A protein has these predicted regions:
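N-terminal helix-turn-helix DNA-binding core of bacterial DNA-binding proteins
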Residues: 2-47
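Accessory beta->alpha helical hairpin/"wing" motif in late/C-terminal subdomains of nucleic-acid enzymes
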Residues: 79-83
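Amphipathic alpha-helical dimerization/coiled-coil segments
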Residues: 85-119
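Beta-hairpin "wing" of winged helix-turn-helix
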Residues: 56-73, 78
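Short, hydrophobic-biased segments on the C-terminal half of alpha helices
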Residues: 49-53
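Conserved catalytic core of Hanks-type protein kinase domains
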Residues: 18, 54-55
């Protein structure tokens, strides 16, 4: 299981990436995160909605009411143009960050032994 501390900075990337595929609502986003992570990460409901609220305030996503379920309208989220731009930037940042962390997390390549020139 992945710790929430290790993944905290990537909630934006995960949600923006999911919404790039189409509009969705909170419960479906949480299930998609769990499924795409192979069950290795489950986002808490409070975390999910806090991230959605922050992304909406920043203009990255927009919320709208969908059809009613169990007597309440379901709130859907959609990606804005600014959100698409931010997603591109976050993906590029992730690639750069990953290469830096890999330099420390992965074992270093084995060095070839030098032959001494004793001719």
């Amino acid at each position: 299981m992945i710790s929430s501390d290790a993944i905290r900075g990537y909630h934006d990337l995960m949600l923006l990436s999911l919404l790039a595929s189409g509009d969705s609502y909170g419960y479906a986003l949480a299930k998609a995160i769990e499924q795409r992570s192979g069950g290795r990460y489950t986002i808490r409901e409070s975390t999910l909605y806090a991230v959605c609220t922050r992304l909406e305030t920043q203009g990255c996503i927009a919320a709208y009411q969908g059809r009613e379920t169990h007597g309440r309208p379901r709130i859907y989220y959609t990606l804005t143009k600014y959100g698409r731009d931010l997603l591109r930037a976050r993906r590029a940042e992730w690639q750069e960050l990953k290469s830096v962390v890999d330099a420390f997390a992965l074992p270093p390549p084995k060095r070839k032994k030098k032959r001494s020139d004793n001719s």
